[in-house]
Amino acid sequence: RGLGDVYKRQSSDELIKSLAPDIIVVVAYGCIIPPQLLHVAKYGCINLHVSLLPKYRGSAPIQWAVLNGDTETGVTIMQLDEGLDTGDILYVQPVAIDPDMTSGELFDRVSAIGAKTLVEVLPKIEAGKLTPKKQEESLATKAPSLTKEMAQFDFTQPAAHIHNWVRGMNPWPMAFFMHDGKKIKVTASKLSENPANAAPGSVLAVKPLTIACQDGAIVLDSVTPEGGKSMAGTAW
């Protein structure tokens, strides 16, 4: 109640300064912290970013790690500066990505590991046991927000790319392909172990629903036809 009254009287900047914090921790905030707040706290302002910085700077690092078929990502705790995920690195905890893991599943994994890592790192920051390390700018990549339009794929693409797209776009916006002018969302897939000697888009099998791609084939385990409900690929 008292904090609410303070918010009414003061700007957020003034409130934070009045609290004289020991440290400011930012997680999945989505905005750049104003420069005037970066050095307000005794131990500075830190950010927990879910990638192996400088790889995947931006708002969708989890999704892009899956979309690109990476087998590993991580939790990076860094000092905030005026840039976008460009501050000095304090601590890195690698996180494995399973072959069929979706972005949603990876989010759950890195959230749990990130929380545990943050609790372990805060005392080390207070004790001065961590040495900030500059990011290697030549290795920097971006992870921009996803859009619905980006979710489309077609079977002229490699099977591995399509599988990664299905995983990476789940739970949002969900990968899809066009069939008879309608969107068919694919919520789960796996790579087929059988070779495909057919044109991309050809149905190789119905049980399980297997489609030929540019190279190899993909099994569509779960689909959602436009205007319909989610169903097994074999039922479509």
Regions found by a protein language model. Name each.
Residues 120-178:
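Active-site-lining helix/loop region of Rossmann-like oxidoreductase modules
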Residues 155-235:
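An anion-binding loop in the catalytic cleft
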Residues 11-20, 39:
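Short amphipathic alpha-helix with an adjacent loop that forms part of the alpha/beta core around
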Residues 8-9, 29-32, 192:
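Short beta->alpha connector loops
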Residues 23-142:
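Donor/substrate-binding cores of folate-linked one-carbon enzymes
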Residues 20-24, 151:
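Short active-site oxyanion
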Residues 2-7:
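Short, small-residue-biased leader/transition segments that mark boundaries at the very start
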